[in-house]
């Protein structure tokens, strides 16, 4: 009887081993998972789980281990003792690690599934089911990293919530980053309950480095602390929807603060607060903070350590730019600051002298364009370009939108006679703001970074350094769309990509063509019809000077003063004009008409565009353009009429 029992027990153990072998064999046989398998083999608890229980294992690839910076990988943190398919994964699952710290599951709108900060590779999941023990393996692209206690602190809890982490941060393995200043402000404001709250939240904690300004810590009140918490939402950086504002705990009737994440092309992650509705203590505007230590899992959510507090606006525009000197490697505007200083730093002094100022600051990536390198060597030209990014006004998105209500907003810069042209499309999170300056169209990728004396808007191109041809500019600029359409159907535009010629193009803006509709309604209609493309092309040819150089407005004013007028070569003939400067604006005098220059000197890689308020159009052009036949057809009709008259006379 005893022998039979022993035999039965041996058979059961063998069956368990066989069941476990199914998943273990798949792990062992996959060479891309060998590093995790070797760790699994040496862990008795993990082996026991595979032998005896249902489970889900999240298995990092070998490539993920190569990117993993920590010395220790925690196998049990990758295992949960219940089987979950991808579809059945709940918001949290308990890991098998000591203290059972949770793993957070995020399913985003793209269909991706994340475990903490690791993405599940959907096609590689494996399921086995033997003797009722269902086991599932999901392959992930990152090693899961739990919050662990430093050696010598055995009394510190293994699975702390955000408050316990904040109180004992020095005892955890978080790269020796201090948070004492913020911790003391949380205690003084009696806001521990915010970090102690049960549930699943995102906590943002400024590090001590962010409180170098002596008065900054005193500005951290209860509302600011609320603004560092996103309640009821766990956001790991890889799973974050970029520029997707989430209501912070400081979102109420009289104060509304949102928080969102965004990522630079170099992979650096930032978080920003946007105070939409402020009060006497909390200004409206955006505050950026770099994430210095991301994705620290705690029992009630996730903690991100950030380089400065959110919501607090306590630096001038100059001080904000100077802060990138200290953050030489990864600052969002590091390159912009370097270019200013390489130019002698006088631009920074000019900015500092302004009581109200707005900066259009190109991102680090914007300076990587090859055509900028040549300009960087020319200090005078570079000074003009930098000044083109400075506005003597406090200009946020709301103010730009007000200026943009009925037309494209025109705003002067500190560069003499140079304007920027803003265009706002969409509402709310769908708002797109573009700005044109010196022939370059840029998109605002981060608006309303607030400072005590103004705003900084981060843009994706350097203004004043053209990167497109005359045709490319016409095609992309909303103010020139009518001229572009007319040139397209008449094939006039075909020549404008030629980089062997230099063009000076006087382009009527859309409102100019709309005025001709009032002055000559019949002609206006026909100018935009393909059947009359010959006439459209002839009129456009008058607006285009073709030479071996382009002519700026200053050139044309100078030539006009010297000779009384300027004669420019065009495709068929020449264009005779006089250009004058009146009160800082330019006026073209053509055939006794005065035409305002709305946007001078829009530079392109193969020429220059001057946007004018009205086309170079005469009444006699309208008579010619009013015909409904091409010249060849007109000649045929005249000949036919002459023949008919001759025949009639002969018959008589």
Curated annotation (Swiss-Prot):
Residues that carry a glycan: 47, 368, 416, 441, 497
GO cellular component, one term: extracellular matrix
Xref: Pfam families: Fasciclin
Membrane topology recorded in Swiss-Prot or TrEMBL: Lipid-anchor; GPI-anchor
Lipidation (GPI-anchor amidated alanine): 625
GO MF annotation list: cell adhesion molecule binding
Gene3D superfamilies referenced in this protein's UniProt entry, alphabetically: FAS1 domain
Predominant cellular place of this UniProt entry's protein: membrane
Residue positions assigned to the propeptide: 626-652
Ranges of residues in domain FAS1: 22-144, 166-310, 317-463, 467-616
GO biological process: axon guidance; calcium-independent cell-cell adhesion via plasma membrane cell-adhesion molecules; cell adhesion; extracellular matrix organization; homophilic cell adhesion via plasma membrane adhesion molecules; neuron recognition
PROSITE patterns to which the protein is assigned, alphabetical: FAS1
Record keywords, A-Z: Cell adhesion, Cell membrane, Glycoprotein, GPI-anchor, Lipoprotein, Membrane, Repeat, Signal
Highest taxon in the source lineage: Eukaryota
Subcellular location: Cell membrane
Entry keyword annotation includes Lyase: no
Signal peptide range: 1-21
Keyword Signal in record: yes
Tissues where the protein occurs: Expressed on different subsets of axon bundles (fascicles) in insect embryos.
Protein name: Fasciclin-1
Originating species: Drosophila melanogaster
């Amino acid at each position: 009887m005893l022998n039979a029992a022993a035999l039965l027990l041996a058979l059961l153990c063998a069956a368990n081993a066989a069941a476990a072998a199914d998943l273990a064999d798949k792990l062992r046989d996959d060479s891309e998972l060998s590093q995790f398998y070797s760790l699994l083999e040496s862990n008795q608890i993990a082996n026991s789980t595979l032998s005896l229980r249902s489970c889900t294992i999240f298995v990092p690839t070998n490539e993920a281990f190569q990117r993993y910076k920590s010395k220790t990988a925690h196998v049990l943190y990758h295992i949960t003792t219940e089987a979950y398919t991808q579809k059945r994964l709940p918001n949290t699952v308990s890991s098998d690690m000591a203290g059972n710290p949770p793993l957070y599951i995020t399913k985003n709108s793209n269909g991706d599934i994340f475990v903490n900060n690791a993405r599940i590779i959907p096609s590689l999941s494996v399921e086995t089911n033997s003797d009722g023990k269902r086991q599932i393996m999901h392959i992930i692209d990152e090693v899961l990293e739990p919050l662990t206690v430093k050696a010598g602190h055995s009394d510190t809890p293994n699975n702390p919530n955000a408050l316990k982490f904040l109180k004992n941060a020095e005892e955890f393995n978080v790269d020796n980053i201090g948070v004492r200043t913020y911790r003391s402000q949380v205690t003084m404001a009696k806001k521990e309950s915010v970090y102690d709250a049960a549930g699943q939240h995102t906590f943002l904690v400024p590090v001590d480095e962010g409180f170098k300004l002596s008065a900054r810590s005193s500005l951290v009140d209860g509302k600011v602390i609320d603004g560092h918490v996103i309640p009821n939402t766990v956001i790991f950086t890889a799973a974050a929807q970029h520029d997707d504002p989430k209501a912070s705990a400081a979102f109420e009737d009289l104060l509304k603060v949102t928080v969102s994440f965004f990522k630079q092309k170099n992979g650096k992650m930032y978080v920003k607060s946007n105070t939409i509705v402020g009060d006497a203590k909390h200004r409206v505007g955006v505050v950026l903070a770099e994430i210095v230590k991301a994705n620290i899992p705690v029992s009630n959510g996730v903690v991100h350590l950030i380089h400065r507090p959110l919501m607090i606006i306590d630096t001038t525009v100059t001080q904000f730019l100077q802060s990138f000197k200290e953050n030489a490697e990864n600052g969002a505007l590091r390159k912009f600051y370097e270019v200013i200083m390489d130019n002698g730093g006088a631009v920074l002094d000019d900015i500092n002298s302004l009581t109200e100022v707005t900066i259009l600051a190109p991102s680090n990536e914007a300076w990587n364009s090859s055509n900028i390198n040549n300009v960087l060597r020319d200090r005078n030209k570079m000074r003009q370009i930098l000044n083109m990014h400075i506005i003597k006004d406090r200009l946020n998105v709301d103010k730009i939108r007000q200026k943009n209500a009925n037309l494209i907003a025109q705003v002067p810069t500190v560069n003499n006679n140079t304007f920027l042209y803003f265009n706002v499309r969409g509402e709310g999170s769908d708002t797109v703001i573009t700005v044109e300056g010196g022939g370059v169209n840029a998109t605002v990728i981060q608006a309303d970074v607030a400072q005590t004396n103004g705003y900084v808007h981060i843009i994706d191109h350097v203004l004043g350094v053209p990167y497109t041809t005359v045709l490319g500019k016409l095609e992309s600029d909303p103010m020139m769309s009518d001229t572009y359409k007319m040139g397209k159907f008449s094939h006039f535009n075909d020549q404008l990509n030629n980089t062997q010629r230099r063009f000076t193009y006087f382009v009527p803006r859309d409102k100019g063509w709309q005025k001709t509709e009032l002055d000559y309604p019949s002609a206006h209609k026909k100018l935009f019809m393909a059947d009359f493309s010959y006439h459209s092309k002839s009129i456009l040819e008058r607006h285009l000077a073709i030479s071996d150089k382009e002519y700026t407005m200053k050139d044309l004013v100078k030539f006009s003063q010297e000779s009384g007028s300027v004669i420019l070569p065009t495709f068929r003939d020449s264009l005779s004009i006089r250009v004058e400067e009146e009160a800082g604006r330019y006026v073209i005098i053509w055939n006794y008409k005065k035409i305002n220059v709305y946007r001078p000197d829009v530079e392109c890689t193969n020429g220059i565009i001057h946007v004018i308020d009205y086309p170079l159009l005469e009444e006699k052009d309208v008579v010619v353009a009013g015909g409904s036949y091409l010249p060849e057809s007109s000649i045929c009709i005249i000949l036919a009429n002459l023949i008919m008259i001759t025949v009639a006379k002969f018959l008589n």
